[in-house]
């Protein structure tokens, strides 16, 4: 895999794909699904205030719906996003 290192206060995240079926068993085409807003952090740039943004590789996050720049790496979808567009960290 090509290594992508985000510059500045940015993250490289991989969207977590949602279920492609409805509760009734109907399979939804990609065009009918909403853009995912959950992702796993793949790489972290240089964060100035690490106490304010405690985000590490492997964390799962919720991000603003239309934030970031979508890119493809080895046929996988990723987003480069500003750390300020991260709304929450998911703890399981």
Swiss-Prot record:
Gene3D superfamilies: GroES chaperonin. InterPro entries: Chaperonin_GroES, Chaperonin_GroES_sf, Chaprnonin_Cpn10_CS, GroES-like_sf. One of its GO terms (cellular component) is cytoplasm. The keyword DNA repair does not apply. GO terms for biological process: chaperone cofactor-dependent protein refolding. It is found in: Cytoplasm. SUPFAM superfamilies: GroES-like. Coiled coil: none annotated. GO terms for molecular function: ATP binding; metal ion binding; protein folding chaperone; protein-folding chaperone binding; unfolded protein binding. Keywords: Chaperone, Cytoplasm. It comes from the Bacteria. It holds the Pfam family Cpn10. Heptamer of 7 subunits arranged in a ring. Interacts with the chaperonin GroEL. PANTHER family: 10 KDA HEAT SHOCK PROTEIN (PTHR10772), 20 KDA CHAPERONIN, CHLOROPLASTIC (PTHR10772:SF63). Together with the chaperonin GroEL, plays an essential role in assisting protein folding. The GroEL-GroES system forms a nano-cage that allows encapsulation of the non-native substrate proteins and provides a physical environment optimized to promote and accelerate protein folding. GroES binds to the apical surface of the GroEL ring, thereby capping the opening of the GroEL channel. Belongs to the GroES chaperonin family. This is Co-chaperonin GroES. It comes from Thermotoga neapolitana.
């Amino acid at each position: 895999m090509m290594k992508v290192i985000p510059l500045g206060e940015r993250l490289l995240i991989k969207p977590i794909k949602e279920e492609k079926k409805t509760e009734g068993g109907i399979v939804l085409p990609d065009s009918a699904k909403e853009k995912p807003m959950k992702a796993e952090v793949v790489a972290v740039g240089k964060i100035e205030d690490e106490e304010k943004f405690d985000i590490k590789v492997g964390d799962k996050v919720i991000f603003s719906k239309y934030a970031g720049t979508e890119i493809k790496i080895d046929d996988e979808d990723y987003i480069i996003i500003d750390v300020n567009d991260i709304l929450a960290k998911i703890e399981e």
